[in-house]
């Protein structure tokens, strides 16, 4: 089995990353396919994410999953809160019995820089030095520090968006990341502003070789 990473946050909340090496039939033997997905690889990612839910909590009722108008999957009776993310040959999921959760994984690439102005506000761009130039990392010439840094920031905002689950979020205006030093793993303080409320959120992140992961679990 290709479990790439698992972190049991506590008895009620677990997350994992699955490295997809199995054929589609492996997942179909255990996971019902709820919706028609024509693209073979996207279908494989979808099945791997559903499979991972049951791997983390064997009694997870994935046959009860429904999709909200915002495209967020959820359980109507909220026996579990969960969030799923896919990229490349990876699927990630976080599941909790008690708290709302969000997760995102991404492969670090230069494309994130091209859209950084859309998801980072002025203060964030100034603090993380992404206002028009790449950060210089002489120790890594193949993949600059800034590729990884920007991917962590993007994942953080995506994880908050998935935690919220109600759509209609402006990443630069509604999600504010507090300054922090980006390392291989750590925590991120964020403020989420919606519905005339400010939510103080604590996210965690981990940077693997060629993969960034960010997650959060918090009561709404």
Model-derived regions, located:
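Core catalytic alpha/beta fold that binds nucleotide/phospho-ligands
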Residues: 1-220
């Amino acid at each position: 089995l290709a479990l790439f990473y698992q972190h049991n946050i506590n008895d009620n909340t677990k997350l994992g990353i699955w490295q997809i090496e199995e054929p589609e039939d492996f997942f179909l033997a255990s996971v019902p396919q709820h919706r028609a997905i024509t693209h073979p690889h996207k279908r494989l990612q979808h099945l791997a994410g559903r499979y991972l839910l049951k791997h983390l909590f064997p009694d997870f009722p994935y046959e009860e999953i429904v999709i909200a108008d915002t495209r967020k999957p959820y359980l109507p009776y909220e026996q579990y809160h969960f969030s799923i993310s896919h990229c490349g040959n990876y699927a990630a999921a976080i599941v909790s019995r008690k708290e709302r959760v969000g997760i995102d994984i991404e492969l670090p690439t230069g494309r994130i820089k091209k859209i950084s102005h859309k998801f980072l506000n002025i203060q964030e761009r100034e603090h993380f030095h992404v206002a028009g130039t790449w950060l210089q990392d002489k120790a890594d010439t193949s993949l600059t520090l800034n590729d990884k840094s920007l991917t962590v920031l993007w994942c953080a905002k995506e994880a908050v968006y998935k935690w919220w689950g109600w759509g209609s979020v402006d990443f630069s205006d509604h999600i504010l990341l507090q300054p922090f030093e980006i390392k291989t793993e750590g925590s991120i303080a964020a403020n989420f502003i919606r519905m005339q409320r400010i939510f103080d959120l604590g996210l965690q992140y981990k940077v693997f070789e060629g993969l960034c992961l960010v997650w959060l679990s918090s009561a709404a």
